[in-house]
């Protein structure tokens, strides 16, 4: 699997948005730890060459991770992940020590047990606001006590500044061992298309891809009745409308993408099961202007010349299994499909999701857009001073639907 590629470990891996971003930057993510068996199975499908460890971080050690993957006794270059934020308790002065916040402490424990050179911890922007900042300060303080220095000031990164057609802000904490040099945060490469206010430091940057760029070349799902009962079919694809969609379809190479090529059937339209809306609902969707909220559902109708709002996950089954609002397609009277959401999140078309619609949208909404993860990973690759080339090995994906 190319030992010259730096080694990474993904904690709280989900379906693997960060795994893919780090792979694209040139890392071999030899182990990914995820407690949810549904996410784990999806991760295993998309990354069959590496170990997907279905376990809780609370019950696993760094040595376990080494033994259950191909890491063995090799040095781990980076550990990354996003401890779930739903359980954060911020009451009291020592929130870090609250048992309800144990997932962050276990993330830190595994970073130190693996003696990782670098770590990246991502989380919601809300942790940087108000009283929540004290919790972030405690996290930093505890990492420093455990022999790691932190890149300061910490930053919130917006996916739309890194070539993703979606407004999505996430906190990234980056650190390294005391004997190493800290990297820098990545600098924006795009500004959000059709944004009402552009910070002056972004004015001269090219626009991010637009909603139109992203989904206009996907087949019209209403023309495929088989998509009412299953999530894939053989389809006729129009010509790509942008470099972005051409890249996600696997028809255009990207010199910055050092991921393993995937061998899959490109005639398949996947993750595209149809939502059956009532006639009344479709009429409301049709009457809603692009870029406006539909008055009853409060769903946003996407502006084809702008970017997508933040795609959210909804709540897990132990918290009510509520579905997050899905945007309305800019040209058709329906909500967007999972594949369209995946495109808006920068997932390539070979990437598959769970067959149940609720799980699939949750998988996307919970994940870091791969292009955003790649931007962060490239800065760590840069500081490691490792030269990595595009692998020749092709990964076969199972195409049984």
Which residues fall in each region the model found?
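Short aromatic/basic micro-patch
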Residues: 82, 118, 335-338
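Class I S-adenosyl-L-methionine
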Residues: 64-73, 91-292
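Short Gly/aromatic-enriched secondary-structure transition segments
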Residues: 46, 188-190, 324-328
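Short glycine-rich anion-binding loops that position phosphate/pyrophosphate groups of nucleotides
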Residues: 83-86, 178-179, 316
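C-terminal target-recognition/interaction regions appended to catalytic cores
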Residues: 234-401
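Core alpha/beta nucleotide-donor-binding catalytic domains of modification enzymes
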Residues: 2-115, 125-129, 133-137, 144
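Redox-cofactor binding/interface segments in oxidoreductases and associated redox assembly factors
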Residues: 81, 121, 312-313
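Short alpha-helical patches at coil-to-helix transitions and adjacent helical residues
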Residues: 15, 170, 208, 366-370, ...
